[in-house]
């Protein structure tokens, strides 16, 4: 059904981009509500969650995302609201074969299914994706972009360096001998095919076709 395809495309893109850029867990993505998001296409968006794994005092956390020139989570979110007509309640919902939205939020275990359905359409070898892939992919991107540990921990919400290090790629510096010769940073091993960073690149290429 055409309506189902349109809904899924916009929902999936918003889910992937928000999940990637904020390094959200599936539980966090499944609990985002329209009432707790403020978005301006030209500025950015804030997302409030009443609790999360790292919010030990259950005081609630507000996350900030900037509007971007490419892979923009803000535009993807606003486009999804416009297409779906959602004005309240949970943002990410299941969609049946007739293009009807569920009243309740998508189950967190279904998010991995969505990521892998998208990957099957993009990759011939069908690597397995999860929200862990998005978190690792964002960390890959941030390290390549020059973020330090403090910036990463503050953005993602990690409370300890040990938690952050689990997601950080190993870097080796060969200086001027490195072919890329851009600071000499070379990552240990080939890029993980199931990295969220790889998924974003293929999504962008698909949109350009």
Region locations from a protein language model:
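Conserved catalytic core of the tyrosine transesterase superfamily
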Residues: 1-131, 141-151, 158-198, 202, ...
């Amino acid at each position: 059904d055409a309506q189902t395809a349109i809904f899924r495309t916009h929902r999936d893109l918003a889910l992937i981009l928000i999940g990637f850029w904020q390094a959200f867990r599936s539980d966090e993505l499944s609990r985002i509500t329209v009432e707790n998001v403020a978005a301006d296409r030209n500025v950015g968006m804030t997302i409030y969650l009443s609790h999360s794994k790292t919010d030990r005092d259950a005081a609630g956390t507000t996350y900030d995302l900037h509007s971007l020139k490419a892979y923009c989570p803000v535009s993807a979110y606003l486009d999804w609201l416009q297409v779906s007509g959602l004005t309240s309640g949970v943002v990410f919902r299941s969609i049946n074969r007739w293009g009807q939205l569920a009243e309740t939020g998508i189950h967190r275990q279904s998010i991995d299914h969505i990521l892998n359905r998208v990957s099957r359409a993009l990759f011939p070898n069908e690597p397995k994706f999860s929200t862990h892939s998005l978190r690792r992919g964002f960390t890959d991107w941030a390290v390549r972009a020059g973020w330090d540990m403090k910036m990463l921990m503050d953005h993602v919400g990690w409370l300890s360096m040990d938690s952050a290090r689990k997601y950080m790629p190993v870097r080796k510096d060969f200086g001027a001998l490195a072919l890329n010769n851009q600071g000499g940073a070379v990552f240990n091993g080939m890029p993980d095919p199931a990295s969220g960073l790889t998924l974003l690149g293929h999504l962008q290429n698909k949109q350009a076709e």
